[in-house]
Amino acid sequence: MASASGAMAKHEQILVLDPPSDLKFKGPFTDVVTTNLKLQNPSDRKVCFKVKTTAPRRYCVRPNSGVIDPGSIVTVSVMLQPFDYDPNEKSKHKFMVQTIFAPPNISDMEAVWKEAKPDELMDSKLRCVFEMPNENDKLNDMEPSKAVPLNASKQDGPLPKPHSVSLNDTETRKLMEECKRLQGEMMKLSEENRHLRDEGLRLRKVAHSDKPGSTSAVSFRDNVTSPLPSLLVVIAAIFIGFFLGKFIL
């Protein structure tokens, strides 16, 4: 009986697993959460592997089987599907990595596993651990720039007081007078523009009666109506410059 039990004893796992025992999934679990499992083959022989789980509907494993060459590493991605987190589930799900030394000729992987003897199989079990981020992790994930103003204020001292932009009575009175003056100039220009417009209409009437002079009349109309926008721009620039000068000084 002892010899029979010894013959049925399984070999120790040839692969080196990283992580060796726990697959940790960090929440929140409202989206797919992925963790990686590295399988290293330190031997001088090819090793076939496959990954199994007790909850196949909850996980997607890529690749879930394959062959690892001597001295090579294969990274297996284990993707946990979204679900409503329940702390009581944290230790229920398990994974198993099953391995076997590859035969000389590998033509059908399914046949390799079907024909494998129990004492040729090697396996390792891992449990799933669900972790929810705590408040400290949330603070560490915040952008560093959000914490900079606090440190900067301590090093640089109190912030300088903003410049006052209020105007005293004398400056206000000057601004009002300047506004009235500019309004008067605007009224004058408006009157001149009306006069020029009337003159243009008169010239157009003359042009209709005298066709040879139509070109010069139209040209004159364009010339007499153009000064107003230029003058308005100049006055607006003076007005804005005056205000900016008052606020800055």
Curated annotation (Swiss-Prot):
MSP domain spans which residues? 14-131
Residues carrying the site annotation Involved in binding the phosphorylated serine of the phospho-FFAT motif = K50
Reported effect of changing M96D? Loss of interaction with OSBPL1A
What does the tissue specificity note say? Ubiquitous.
Tell me which residues bear Phosphothreonine. T170
Q: What is the effect of changing K94D?
A: Loss of interaction with OSBPL1A
| Compositional bias annotation for Basic and acidic residues | 135-144
* Keywords associated with the record: Acetylation, Cell junction, Cell membrane, Coiled coil, Disulfide bond, Endoplasmic reticulum, Membrane, Nucleus, Phosphoprotein, Tight junction, Transmembrane, Transmembrane helix
Q: Which GO terms describe its biological process?
A: ceramide transport; cholesterol transport; COPII-coated vesicle budding; endoplasmic reticulum to Golgi vesicle-mediated transport; endoplasmic reticulum-plasma membrane tethering; negative regulation by host of viral genome replication; neuron projection development; phospholipid transport
The keyword Protein transport is assigned to this record: no
Pfam families referenced in this protein's UniProt entry, alphabetically: Motile_Sperm
Subcellular location(s): the record lists: Endoplasmic reticulum membrane; Cell membrane; Cell junction, Tight junction; Nucleus membrane
Where is the signal peptide, in residue numbers? none
Write down which residues bear the modification named N-acetylalanine: A2
Positions bearing N6-acetyllysine: K125
Which residues are listed as membrane-spanning?
Answer: 228-248
Region (Disordered) residue spans: 135-166
Q: Which InterPro entries match?
A: Ig-like_fold, MSP_dom, PapD-like_sf, VAP
How is the quaternary structure described?
Answer: Homodimer; disulfide-linked. Heterodimer with VAPB. Interacts with VAMP1, VAMP2, STX1A, BET1, SEC22C and with the C-terminal domain of OCLN. Interacts (via MSP domain) with OSBPL1A (via FFAT motif). Interacts (via MSP domain) with ZFYVE27; may retain ZFYVE27 in the endoplasmic reticulum and regulate its function in cell projections formation. Interacts with OSBP. Interacts (via C-terminus) with RSAD2/viperin (via C-terminus). Interacts with IFITM3. Interacts with OSBPL3 (phosphorylated form). Interacts with KIF5A in a ZFYVE27-dependent manner.
Which comment does the entry carry about domains? The MSP domain binds the FFAT motif of many proteins.
- Name under which the protein is recorded: Vesicle-associated membrane protein-associated protein A
